[in-house]
Amino acid sequence: MNITDIMNAIDAIKALPICELDKRQGMLIDLLVEMVNSETCDGELTELNQALEHQDWWTTLKCLTADAGFKMLGNGHFSAAYSHPLLPNRVIKVGFKKEDSGAAYTAFCRMYQGRPGIPNVYDVQRHAGCYTVVLDALKDCERFNNDAHYKYAEIASDIIDCNSDEHDELTGWDGEFVETCKLIRKFFEGIASFDMHSGNIMFSNGDVPYITDPVSFSQKKDGGAFSIDPEELIKEVEEVARQKEIDRAKARKERHEGRLEARRFKRRNRKARKAHKAKRERMLAAWRWAERQERRNHEVAVDVLGRTNNAMLWVNMFSGDFKALEERIALHWRNADRMAIANGLTLNIDKQLDAMLMG
């Protein structure tokens, strides 16, 4: 689209008779959309991870819109607002991403027209490379120079961004504005991010606040699941809510299964530790019994052989052979005691005591 086409379109709009002045809005929108579609190739050149200032076509589009008489009032990450002398007291907002959270908020505004804080939406359309919204012309928020602007900006930021309830005691129009902020928070919670800074609230000439764009953009290529039709938006929000419930249920199931598996793992480990402890105690008891038995065998062998002979054998024999010898001597000693008990004879210990105490 060149400057000649633009000027011809402007001349055609200016030439409209008084009875057809209501067509100006639609013709200006068509002209602006045609310039956007021409520069962005119907949105194909729009990079979703870049701000407008970093788009290759942005500078050229600014020049074309300025040549057509459009005045850019400001721009966000994916949208810009324009005014035109042929459309007084109105602003055309252009969203360069056909379906995003801004379009969803526009549909929300259409659903709740007339509520305090909700801007008036006179027209909304989706095009090949963008969407357009016609709104009232509003003033920027002078947060630090106007007490009323500061108050309403704080209320909107506290409720929408932080879900605060410190303003619940407000009544009258302010109370209705608080309820609108809560409604926005409830409607978009979980499906969009909130970005309620002072640039997203504007004021009329009478300092009436209007929340213009409290939800932030998405970088998904398909533009997200938002629509500019209210009924479709409600269905999509309900679907998102259902999907959120499903995701929460799946997450609960995963956590439950994780806890069950953790309990099974702890139970297996507890049983294994208990079995290992019992085995260790059995092995320790067997080792202690064997050690005491070896000591008893040694004492019996010393009594039978004498301490000197036992020591000489210990020196001249391998340790295994010496231990086996002491076991055989102790076994013979015990068997002899059993035979003595069976035959009513004196025990070996009695013989030792007789020898020790004799005389």
Swiss-Prot record:
In-chain residues carrying the UniProt-annotated modification Phosphoserine: 216
Keyword tags: ATP-binding, Bacterial host gene expression shutoff by virus, Bacterial host transcription shutoff by virus, Coiled coil, Host gene expression shutoff by virus, Host-virus interaction, Kinase, Nucleotide-binding, Phosphoprotein, Serine/threonine-protein kinase, Transferase
Keyword Membrane: no
A single GO BP: symbiont-mediated suppression of host gene expression
Domain of life: Viruses
Catalytic activity: L-seryl-[protein] + ATP = O-phospho-L-seryl-[protein] + ADP + H(+); L-threonyl-[protein] + ATP = O-phospho-L-threonyl-[protein] + ADP + H(+)
E.C. number(s) listed in UniProt: 2.7.11.1
Broad EC category: transferase
Coiled coil: 231-283
InterPro entries listed in its UniProt record: Protein_kinase_T7-type
Transmembrane residue ranges: none
Gene Ontology MF terms in the entry: ATP binding; protein serine kinase activity; protein serine/threonine kinase activity
Known function: Serine/threonine kinase that modulates host metabolism to favor virus replication cycle. Participates together with gene 2 protein (gp2) in the host transcription shutoff. Phosphorylates host RNA polymerase subunit RpoC and to a lesser extent subunit RpoB. This modification seems to increase rho-dependent transcription termination, which may help to switch from host to viral RNA polymerase transcription during phage development. Phosphorylates host components of the RNA degradosome rne and RhlB, leading to stabilization of mRNAs synthesized by T7 RNA polymerase.
Name of the protein this chain belongs to: Protein kinase 0.7
Organism field: Escherichia phage T7
